[in-house]
């Protein structure tokens, strides 16, 4: 398969192919323009993969530009986080990082040009009055009483705005377009508003700040962007994008194209709702492993490759749809099944004593790090006469479908011996505290000599060598597929989205590092937590289970 055939195809790439073939463009230049007022989520990952991926595939350029036009909500913390997320996903921007604030002088000059052309005016309606005058989807708006001021008066008033002569909310600069337009975005939109706030890049140089719709089209043009890619909610805004560029003196006029945003089941993408989850402490922070943020997914154990693969699979279309969470989970499950080394850990432990094993002795058993990848090597795991097994792996009575340890029957310990359950001890409440077994000493990693069949295999950890570990069983944050449509989305938070267990792991887990996943055999995929784990306390996060339990529950 050629490189061109291996590329994903979609309507945007078809447009680019046509533009290059016709000579409209000789190169491709895209941009990713986040506002630094929060953490990026999986929806942003789709845009990152699209913009940077297109630039990569066409040997073009992709800018990282921060749309920093609202100093009240923005912070350098978010700038640093966004840069880190883009690089972690495997991309790098062309040249220096850009900021919309780099262009504040040019943007101001273009605003003055619109005033001089009679296409912008200073309005002194209150924000509430502006909303009232704007009209509705079924009723036209009405002109502001300040709409017909002279060019000279508007220039003087705009300068007064710039020099701090108005209080916040007392004046703004609006485009003069058409208050009867069927598109509300074209009903004399605000171009500049007053904000007395220190900016993280420009300090206190400005007290007027341009609006997004005025800023990003001009920024695209100044940077020579060839294809400006936005999500579908900006489709109507394209009219304003084109109007601004058509009415100022600028040599380049990029085109805006819209694609569907990513909607994912069992979570929310709204920045307001995500912020509420954090501020009301329903989650531990923006990087909580249950959050759809890139930092949360990373901490949970998702790999950059799995997120890129997910974005590739869902594709780019113009139709809004909701993607199943199972699709994202299958991407990380496939990645880790292929690449994660194996280890043994017992999440709900019960003691098992092998009564005929030499007392006080232990031995090392050899285990492959990956059953299908001998190149990943093997490890030595200690075995002794007292081990931990998972409580769910033993029953006093069971039917034939239960292939684990049953009283009076045999099971194999993974890569070790065949054992037989003989008796149990229980506490006053009737809970099993210890299982007593015997073992067949001639079955170390081989079948019994007499030919009897032992079908079940369970995992274990030597009690004398076990590492105490905290295991955080993360699950979907919400209990319904579309929490955003609930009357109160907080009421459908999954109460079992985090269950904390105290278990035991094999000694090799002492070398675990954050960001490197393991398959805990027969349990799922786990990684060391980057926040809570210490040298003295190992804390592992469940990234994803071995199979989709939600699909089974829904059947």
UniProtKB/Swiss-Prot annotation:
Span of the signal peptide: none
Keywords: Aminoacyl-tRNA synthetase, ATP-binding, Cytoplasm, Ligase, Nucleotide-binding, Protein biosynthesis
Gene3D superfamilies: Glutamyl-trna Synthetase, Domain 2, Glutamyl-tRNA Synthetase, Domain 3, HUPs, Ribosomal Protein L25, Chain P
HAMAP family named in the record: Gln_tRNA_synth
Region feature (Interaction with tRNA): 317-324
Pfam family, one: tRNA-synt_1c_C
Residue window of motif 'HIGH' region: 34-44
Annotated InterPro entries: aa-tRNA-synth_I_CS (IPR001412), Gln-tRNA-synth (IPR004514), Gln/Glu-tRNA_Ligase (IPR050132), Gln_tRNA_ligase_bac (IPR022861), Glu/Gln-tRNA-synth (IPR000924), Glu/Gln-tRNA-synth_Ib_cat-dom (IPR020058), Glu/Gln-tRNA-synth_Ib_codon-bd (IPR020059), Glu_tRNA_lig_a-bdl (IPR020061)
Assembly, per entry: Monomer.
Annotated L-glutamine binding sites: 67, 212
Protein location: Cytoplasm
Any single Gene Ontology cellular-component annotation: cytosol
Protein name: Glutamine--tRNA ligase
Family, as annotated: Belongs to the class-I aminoacyl-tRNA synthetase family.
Residue positions of motif 'KMSKS' region: 268-272
Principal EC category: ligase
EC id: 6.1.1.18
Binding site for ATP: 35-37, 41-47, 231, 261-262, 269-271
GO molecular function: ATP binding; glutamine-tRNA ligase activity
Domain of life according to the entry: Bacteria
GO biological process: one example: glutaminyl-tRNA aminoacylation
Reaction catalyzed: tRNA(Gln) + L-glutamine + ATP = L-glutaminyl-tRNA(Gln) + AMP + diphosphate
């Amino acid at each position: 398969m050629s490189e061109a055939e291996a590329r994903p195809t979609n309507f945007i790439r078809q447009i680019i192919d046509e533009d290059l073939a016709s000579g409209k463009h000789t190169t491709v230049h895209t941009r990713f323009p986040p506002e630094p007022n929060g953490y990026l989520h999986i929806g942003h990952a789709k845009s990152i993969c699209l913009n940077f991926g297109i630039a990569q595939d066409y040997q073009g350029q992709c800018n990282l530009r921060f749309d920093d036009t609202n100093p009240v909500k923005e912070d350098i913390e978010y700038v640093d986080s966004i840069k880190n997320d883009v690089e972690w996903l495997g991309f790098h921007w062309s040249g220096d990082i850009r900021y919309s604030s780099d262009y504040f002088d040019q943007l101001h000059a273009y605003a003055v040009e619109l005033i001089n052309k009679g296409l912008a005016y200073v309005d002194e309606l209150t924000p509430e009055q502006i909303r009232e005058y704007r009209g509705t989807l079924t009723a036209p708006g009405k002109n502001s009483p300040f709409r017909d001021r002279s060019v000279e008066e508007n220039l003087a008033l705009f300068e007064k705005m710039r020099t701090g002569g108005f209080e916040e909310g007392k004046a703004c600069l609006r485009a003069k377009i058409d208050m009867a337009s069927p598109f509300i975005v074209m009903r004399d939109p605000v171009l500049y508003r007053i904000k007395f706030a220190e900016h993280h890049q420009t300090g206190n140089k400005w007290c007027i700040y341009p609006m997004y719709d005025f800023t990003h089209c001009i920024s695209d043009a100044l940077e020579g962007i060839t294809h400006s890619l936005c999500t579908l909610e900006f489709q109507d805004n394209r009219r304003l994008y084109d109007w601004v560029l058509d009415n100022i003196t600028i040599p380049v006029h990029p085109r805006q194209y819209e694609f569907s945003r990513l909607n994912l089941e069992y979570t929310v993408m709204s920045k307001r709702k995500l912020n509420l989850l954090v501020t009301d402490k329903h989650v531990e922070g923006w990087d909580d492993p249950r959050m759809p943020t890139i930092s949360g997914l990373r901490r949970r154990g998702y790999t950059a490759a799995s997120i890129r693969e997910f974005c590739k699979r869902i594709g780019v279309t113009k139709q809004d749809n909701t993607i199943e969470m199972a699709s994202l989970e299958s991407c990380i499950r496939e990645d880790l099944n292929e690449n994660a080394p194996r280890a043994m850990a017992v999440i709900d432990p019960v003691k098992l004593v092998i009564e005929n094993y030499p007392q006080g002795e232990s031995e090392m058993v050899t285990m492959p790090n990956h059953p299908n990848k001998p190149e990943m090597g093997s490890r030595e795991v200690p075995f002794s006469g007292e081990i931990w097994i998972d409580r769910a792996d033993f029953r006093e009575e069971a039917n034939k479908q239960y292939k684990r340890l049953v009283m009076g029957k045999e099971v194999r310990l993974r890569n070790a011996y065949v054992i037989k359950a003989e008796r149990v001890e229980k506490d006053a409440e009737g809970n099993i505290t210890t299982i007593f077994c015997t073992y067949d000493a001639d079955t170390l990693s081989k079948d019994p000599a007499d030919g009897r069949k032992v079908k079940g295999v369970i995992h274990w950890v030597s009690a004398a060598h076990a590492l105490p570990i905290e295991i955080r069983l993360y699950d979907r944050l919400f209990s319904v597929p579309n929490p955003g449509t609930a009357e109160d989305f907080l009421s459908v938070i999954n109460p079992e989205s985090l269950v904390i267990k105290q278990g035991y792991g094999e000694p090799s887990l002492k070398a675990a590092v954050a960001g490197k996943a393991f398959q805990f055999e027969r349990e799922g995929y786990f990684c060391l937590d980057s926040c809570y784990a210490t040298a003295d306390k190992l804390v592992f996060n469940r990234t994803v289970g071995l199979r989709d339990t939600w699909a089974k529950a829904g059947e």
